[in-house]
From Swiss-Prot:
It is found in: Cytoplasm. This is Peptidyl-tRNA hydrolase. It holds the Pfam family Pept_tRNA_hydro. The record marks N12 as: Discriminates between blocked and unblocked aminoacyl-tRNA. Monomer. It comes from the Bacteria. TRNA binds at Y17, Y69, N71, N117. It comes from Arthrobacter sp. (strain FB24). It is an enzyme of class 3 (hydrolase).
Length: 194
């Protein structure tokens, strides 16, 4: 297997979804693409892909935004991991997380999917839950609002001013985990004042 990392930003395709909370993973990938340099190209695995390094001499990464809907992300992720010969331990899924407050980033490996159908599909396709997750907090829906309706809406006006900072923090978390490991990233992002 290779030392390359597959970094996957989860979301839904199409401009009507591009600013939704559910697409925050793909927004983070756009920030990482800016850092890597270059532009995404269509890959036969049904994903937009950018290959490069995170910094000079940094780890080799494949940034990927599946062209499928969120809930069926597993096929493209599995196909890319096979194409690039990447073990699940080197797969990082960047996704929205309603159980974490907005403007917060958490990391973990394995465990449950917390009702996140995109993660569930990736776990099924990879035949393991043991891949890394960068969980980008979008908060819980207000009142009795349906969770699906909440994540399929754009960020609130009050959140939009802080969104660039959240995307930057999440991209930094991805860089930390691939450069220094999960423990270092968790120490930084689970104990830091956000």
């Amino acid at each position: 297997m290779t030392d390359t990392w597959l970094i996957v930003g989860l979301g839904n395709p199409g401009t009507e979804y591009s600013n939704n909370r559910h697409n925050v993973g793909q927004m983070v990938l756009d920030e990482l693409a800016r850092r890597v340099g270059g532009s995404f190209k269509v890959h036969k695995a049904r994903a937009h892909v950018l290959e490069g390094r995170l910094g000079i001499g940094g780890p080799r990464v494949v940034l990927a935004k599946p062209m499928s809907y969120m809930n069926v992300s597993g096929g493209p992720v599995s196909a890319l991991s096979k194409f690039y010969d990447i073990d699940p331990e080197h797969v990082v899924a960047v996704h929205d997380e309603i159980d974490i407050p907005f403007n917060t980033v958490k990391l973990k490996i394995g465990g449950g999917e917390g009702g996140h159908n995109g993660l569930r599909d990736i776990s099924k396709a990879l035949a393991t839950k043991d891949y890394l997750r960068v969980r980008v907090g979008v908060g819980r829906p207000p009142g009795r609002m349906d969770t699906a309706d909440f994540v399929l809406k754009d960020f609130a006006t009050t959140e939009k001013k802080d969104l660039p900072f959240l995307l930057d923090d999440a991209a930094d978390a991805v860089e930390t985990v691939v450069r220094e490991g999960l423990a270092a990233a968790q120490q930084k992002y689970h104990t830091a004042v956000q």
